Amino acid sequence: MPIKLGIVPVTPYEQNCSILVCQETGDAAVVDPGGDIEKILDGVKQMGGSVKKILLTHGHLDHCAAAKDLADQLDVPIEGPQEDERFWIDQLPEQTVRFGFGHAKVFEPDRWLNNGDHVKVGNVDFEVFHCPGHTPGHVVFFDKEDRLAIVGDVLFAGSIGRTDFPRGNHADLINAIKTKLWPLGDDVQFVPGHGPMSTFGQERKTNPYVGDRA
């Protein structure tokens, strides 16, 4: 397996911050650093990686509140999410104060991502899928070779992302899961934004919202 995966739960919301390390090069990416920077850096150190970029699935504070500080500290770029997520990122200072997260900075990602784009972590390629519904500019990262997806708050073990936030859309979320994620294969393991990992096949069998019987 060319990619090495570590998961560090961060913030009071226990958000799954993923650390991805290319085993061939040692290059690493941090996905969705919502907070607890020292905890994340300890995880990177334990995995033996050298962080080259930060990847973001979407703009909610528990996924990206520490992105700017971490990027500045490590002098690395931020890639993602899709540009419709500017709506949420611009609210970070207000949202983080309101929910007791300190005071996060507004930032402009170095690269907005679109459906069909690719991002590299060392020699490992991740395809980008735009999966709106939970938020308008949410993206999913898929490593075809390792059969691994980082899905943020699109899909969970036994559930799906909330769609009652501003600019959320339930029909869009269901459509994105069924038309973009399911075709990738039942054997694909995924890291959700919260809770345990699962596979697309398991969710197709048992998920009450997007399973084949739903």
Where in the sequence are the language-model features?
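Conserved beta-strand hairpin/beta-sheet module of binuclear metal-dependent hydrolase folds
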Residues: 2-47, 140-152
